[in-house]
Amino acid sequence: MSKIIFHIDVNSAFLSWSAVEKLKNGNQVDLREIPSIIGGDEASRHGIVLAKSVSAKRYGVTTGEPIAQALRKCANLVMEPPNHKMYREYSRRLMEYFKTYTPDLEQLSVDECFLDYTPIAHLYGEPVAFANRLKNEIKETFGFTVNVGISEVKILAKMASDFEKPDKVHTLWKSEIRQKMWPLPVSELYMVGKSSLPKLRNLGIHTIGDLAQMNPEILEAHLKSFGKLIWQNANGIGSDVVESEETAAKGVGNSTTLREDVTDVQTAKKVLLELSESVSGRLRKSGFFAGNVAVEIKYSDFTKCSHQAPFLTPTNSTGKIYELSCRLFEELWNGAPIRLLGIRTSKLQDENEPVQMSLFDLDFSKEVKTEQSFTKGPNREKLEKLDKAMDDIKKRFGDGAIVRGSSLIKEKQSLSAQEE
């Protein structure tokens, strides 16, 4: 029996959430109704466009382009800086809302998720009707709109949600691929990017249908395993398994009980750095990327709390794990003395699998004030080389042979460590 999978995507999420928040705080102008963007620094006019309104799009403004270029296209463009903490909170509320219907939910990023409708179809009826109900409830409850794509497999549901926007429901059943998807430009297929387009065009591939009907062995010869993957995407071949938090439970983690209670942010972050080193090293040794990280705190009165968030791009980088862990810690910690700190990564995938890049690989925020020497900036290759160099030294001379300067603590903080 075929499954029924929803892909739900917030329309221009960062701009929508900023607009809703400003309206709640008394702003008279809706950012979604004027030429506006999210991104950059208004004073310096540096950075890139992270999200744009429909009217900004009419001026030719595109996501990912430099702010200065966008302003040349539209002189009266309104620019709003990003608020990542607020976006994560809106995302959390939305996911909790979906869970009132079903626990079978797989969050892909802050603004999109898969939902397995199959187990609840008998309760709510025809899927398109329920999807319309769902998107209308979101609009009324939260004030922003979503698109819902529906199919038997995840890749087609995701493609369907990218059809006409905003505030729409679309189906892309396997029987509809030839009619709805194959005529589209190949650039619109999920995971086909700028680097692969020239190679595809050299092979005479211009539409998704061209790709779908190409001999996959030829694609593999030119694009290696990636060629096979996009051929499968073009033919609607993919997983129908929605990996909820429960099914994606396997992960890599580490926690440490502290010799003395920690009462300041700086010391806590040094401990988080050491934990990030340990966890990321084990991920790299095992050949995994992590899609999610959680931070756990146990206070001196032995009460516990934890907070988790997805990475924008799956990673095994020490810097990225540390950066997000620090953000989670800052949101979670209530100021009480800390007895134990822990980090756990989950939603593991083989590091050889293709990874969808995020705009945030180009523009890290500056929320984390420590360790900027390796968390600030976009140079992914330098981060990977640093991690590899440290891994090689530890493998040859032992774990204590090299540490980052900022993790040198006068007195050893850790009493005991526990791996997961």
Model-assigned labels for residue ranges:
Residues 188, 196-338, 353:
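DNA-contacting surface of Y-family translesion DNA polymerases
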Residues 8, 115, 148, 295-297, ...:
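Preference for bulky hydrophobic residues occupying beta-strand positions
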Residues 311-420:
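Acidic, metal-coordinating catalytic segment for phosphate/diphosphate chemistry
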Residues 1-232, 281, 369, 377-420:
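Gly/Gly-Pro- and Ser/Thr-rich, intrinsically disordered tail segments characteristic of DNA damage-repair
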Residues 152-155, 234-236, 289-300, 338-349, ...:
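A glycine-rich phosphate-binding loop feature that marks nucleotide/adenosyl-phosphate handling sites
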Residues 11-13, 42-45, 300-304, 348-351:
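Short, charged/polar surface micro-motifs in flexible loops or helix N-caps
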